Amino acid sequence: MTKIKQEIYNKRPTSPHLTIYKPQISSTLSILHRMTGVALFFVVSILVWWLILSKYDNNYLQLARCCIIKICLVAFSYAWCYHLCNGIRHLFWDIGYGFSIRAVNITGWCVVVCSILLTMLLWV
């Protein structure tokens, strides 16, 4: 590298490193929305397979009484409720509402609270 190129390269702005970056609610919820979407695809596939097997063998149906399976089903319910609520939030964004920083933060927390409440409503 020539001396001029080296000087230009050294003066370029650098991006903040991840260790000093504070995650925001919007970025965290965006990543969580993608993760729940992928997880729901696989979990629904497994649930359909499990339901088909339980039709032919009652032992698979007895698995639903296991505590670990119940915890997994509650986690699945939360992921589904979260993905639903955040999808509704995205629909409002698609029509042009809620793009201010304040609105994004408020609706983000509303999505988290509503998904918890919906999950509790499903299991109580």
Curated annotation (Swiss-Prot):
Regions of this protein lying in the Cytoplasmic compartment: 1-29, 89-103
Main localization category? membrane
Q: Which PROSITE patterns does the record cross-reference, listed alphabetically?
A: SDH_CYT_1 (PS01000), SDH_CYT_2 (PS01001)
GO BP term, example:
tricarboxylic acid cycle
Where in the cell does this protein reside? Cell inner membrane
Question: According to its UniProt record, in which pathway does this protein act?
Answer: Carbohydrate metabolism; tricarboxylic acid cycle
**Could you list the residue ranges that cross the membrane?**
30-55, 68-88, 104-124
Tell me the cofactors it needs. Answer: heme
**Cofactor, how bound (note):** The heme is bound between the two transmembrane subunits.
Any one GO CC term of the record: plasma membrane
Enumerate the InterPro entries for this protein: SQR/QFR_C/D (IPR034804), Succ_DH_cyt_bsu_CS (IPR018495), Succ_DH_cytb556 (IPR014314), SuccDH_FuR_B_TM-su (IPR000701)
Q: One Pfam family from the UniProt entry?
A: Sdh_cyt
- Binding, heme: 83
User: Which keywords label this protein?
Assistant: Cell inner membrane, Cell membrane, Electron transport, Heme, Iron, Membrane, Metal-binding, Transmembrane, Transmembrane helix, Transport, Tricarboxylic acid cycle
From what superkingdom does this record's organism come?
Bacteria
Q: How does the protein associate with the membrane?
A: Multi-pass membrane protein
Q: Does the keyword Transport apply?
A: yes
Role summary:
Membrane-anchoring subunit of succinate dehydrogenase (SDH).
* Family from the record: Belongs to the cytochrome b560 family.
Assembly and oligomerization: Part of an enzyme complex containing four subunits: a flavoprotein, an iron-sulfur protein, plus two membrane-anchoring proteins, SdhC and SdhD. The complex can form homotrimers.
**What PANTHER family does the record point to?**
SUCCINATE DEHYDROGENASE CYTOCHROME B560 SUBUNIT, SUCCINATE DEHYDROGENASE CYTOCHROME B560 SUBUNIT, MITOCHONDRIAL
Q: What is this protein called?
A: Succinate dehydrogenase cytochrome b556 subunit
According to the entry, what is the taxonomic lineage of the organism?
A: Bacteria, Pseudomonadati, Pseudomonadota, Alphaproteobacteria, Rickettsiales
Gene that produces this protein: sdhC
